[in-house]
Amino acid sequence: MLVTAAVAAALLLASCGGSDDAKGGKKVSIALTNNGCAPAKLSTPAGPTTFEITNKGSDKATEFEVQKGSEILGEKENITDGLSGSFSLNLQPGRYTTFCGQGTPKGVLVVTGKAQKAQANPQLDAAVRGYDRYVRDQVVALRTATKAFTDAVRAGDVEKAKQLYAAARVRYERIEPVAESFGGLDPAIDARINDVAKGQEWTGFHRIEQALWTKGSTNGMAPIADKLDEDVGLLETKVDAASYQPAQLANGAVELLNEVSKSKITGEEERYSHLDLVDFQANVDGAKQAFVLLRPALNRRNPTLARTVASRFDGVDAALAPYRRGVTFVDYSTVDPAQRRKLSQAVDALGEPLSQVGGTIVAS
């Protein structure tokens, strides 16, 4: 899931803009260029760190990731030319990889010194335990809902499969940043056709979605359904072994809103079924759950920020309300550009204060 990372060592501080913040955490400036992340080599002492990322005219590098082995510890996506973003984490000693997007070279981050034990904070500990339970519950429900969906696909029952599709999607979209942290699992489960590189097989929910809504058939989909069950089972196994930091909850909430802006508002996510608002709501649900769990700690540190974020979540709920139809939503193709702009504005209004939560709690 999403997290953060580092600062430059003393020799690099000037060149990459690293500094201590007022609360003792570290900040490091990262530039996205067509040559990749700059600087490409970082060394930083262990402890709370915030990456501040700016796109310096690149159309290739539009994200920043910190990886440990095959796991993505932290990331910030969709940073196009002129935009910036940040994320935070309490880094432990070790060697990490940085990455700025397809076609760019990977960099190296070395975290030095002794492990920094987070200060005892019962509220943050409770938030992490609560989120762990939430993710586990969602992935169990995902497995069950996916199996019902894939059983209908294998049985050739197109209408039943269509009816069951949304229930599985909701469970996945609520915890998508967790799935994304496990390397290739998210592409296997959730890739859209334009995400698939030449020579790779397209698998997952959207491959079946296309067959159901554009062809009205499940012909050839049984192997795709089998693999989807397998990949969801693997996700459950990985979730059972996962652990989280408080900043990951906050960063994951921000990334869920990024998902809304990137693919739900545009109508790209569910381009065949037009169930984009179902996914939109699920992303917001997941983000809100993380915030609700973190709010007691945030109230102590910055109650004004906590109230602002809560109010902006209410604003998103109000923006979605006209499109609700019982437990579902209208076909997204019926939502006109002006209405989509209003939805986007509500999400953007929430995203800005929500992005401050991670940096606030990481120094708690």
Could you say what each language-model-derived stretch is?
Residues 40-59, 85-100, 226:
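Beta-strand cores of secreted/periplasmic/IMS beta-sandwich domains, seen most often
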Residues 29, 79-120:
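Extracellular/periplasmic metallocenter environments
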Residues 17-20:
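Bacterial signal peptide processing site
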Residues 1-5:
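Bacterial N-terminal signal peptides that target proteins for export
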Residues 12-15:
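C-terminal motif of bacterial Sec signal peptides marking the signal peptidase cleavage site
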Residues 117-364:
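Mature extracytoplasmic or organellar-lumen-exposed domains after removal of signal/transit peptides
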